[in-house]
UniProtKB/Swiss-Prot annotation:
Keyword Cell membrane among UniProt keywords: no
Protein name (database record): NH(3)-dependent NAD(+) synthetase
Entry binding sites for ATP: 46-53, 160, 189, 211
Lineage: Bacteria, Bacillati, Bacillota, Bacilli, Lactobacillales
Reactions this protein catalyses: deamido-NAD(+) + NH4(+) + ATP = AMP + diphosphate + NAD(+) + H(+)
Length: 274
């Protein structure tokens, strides 16, 4: 089996999907998880205004609406939380996403003071914090905020990881990679767009250029620029298609470099890193 085939199998990507079936699959998955854990009553998710959190948020909201209708338990709620660092440049996009999601509860936790305090505390030891490192601190503070809210509201944290992000390791370890449940896992980027289209999202919600937007020196840096490969190439690879040798090498290099992000902390029994 080729590495491409191994990755596709591991991530569970289909070459072609039925968008309605995948919507139902994700909603039912979220509902089953809460039914299995009756002490959980909420899902919490940070909403950035990008495609992934918009899709995951809408699926979570639909799951909660169905659970309330099926059980008569009005304590089932979806909590959408904005997590800006100061003022977010594309706040209007986040508000469009919230208008589409229509969450039961919408909160704002501004992470700027927490991030700046942690950065200052680390630098006080004589250890410089690079802009890239500070970007990861932002992602991890967002994770802390979501888990704090989940802890306050008997909840679980939803993650937005999907196949095109997972294969490249394009997430912060213990940051946006920290979550309890991943309703988009198995979908590539274009398939996520198909689900949003089926859900009736306006084009602006899925045509926006993807960006992690964590670095202040490079605001709004496009994912594709940071990765050195396009999402179209990543999606083609995940669908089993032939792409250029250069793009394939780039994708597979990211796969190898990001292996540690997909695993629990390394033990003496692990050898994948050797």
């Amino acid at each position: 089996m080729s590495l491409q085939e191994t990755i596709i199998q591991e991530l569970g990507v289909k070459p072609v999907i039925d968008a309605q079936e995948e919507i139902r699959r994700s909603i039912d998955f979220l509902k089953r998880y809460l039914k299995k854990h009756p002490f959980l009553k909420t899902f919490v998710l940070g909403i950035s205004g990008g495609q992934d959190s918009t899709l995951a948020g809408r699926l979570a909201q639909l799951a909660m609406e169905e659970l309330r209708a099926e059980t008569g338990d009005d304590s089932y709620k979806f909590i959408a939380v904005r997590l800006p660092y100061g003022v977010q440049a594309d706040e209007a996009d986040a508000q469009k996403a919230l208008a589409f999601i229509q969450p039961d509860v919408s909160l704002v936790v501004n992470i700027k003071e927490s991030v700046d305090a942690m950065t200052a505390a680390v630098e006080a030891t004589g250890s410089p914090v690079s802009d890239f490192n500070k970007g990861n601190i932002k992602a991890r503070c967002r994770m802390i905020a979501q888990y704090a809210l989940a802890g306050s509201h008997s909840g679980a944290v939803i993650g937005t990881d999907h196949a095109a992000e997972n294969i490249t390791g394009f997430f912060t370890k213990f940051g946006d990679g920290g979550a309890d449940i991943l309703p988009l896992y198995r979908l590539n980027k274009r398939q996520g767009k198909q689900l949003l289209q089926k859900l009736g999202a306006e084009p602006a919600l899925y045509e926006k250029i993807p960006t992690a937007d964590l670095e202040e020196d490079k605001p709004g840096l496009a994912d594709e620029v940071a990765l050195g490969v396009t999402y179209a190439e990543i999606d083609d690879y995940l669908e089993g298609k032939t792409i250029s040798p250069e793009a394939q090498a780039t994708i597979e290099n990211w796969w190898h470099k990001g292996q540690h992000k997909r695993r629990l902390p390394i033990t003496v029994f692990d050898d994948f890193w050797e």
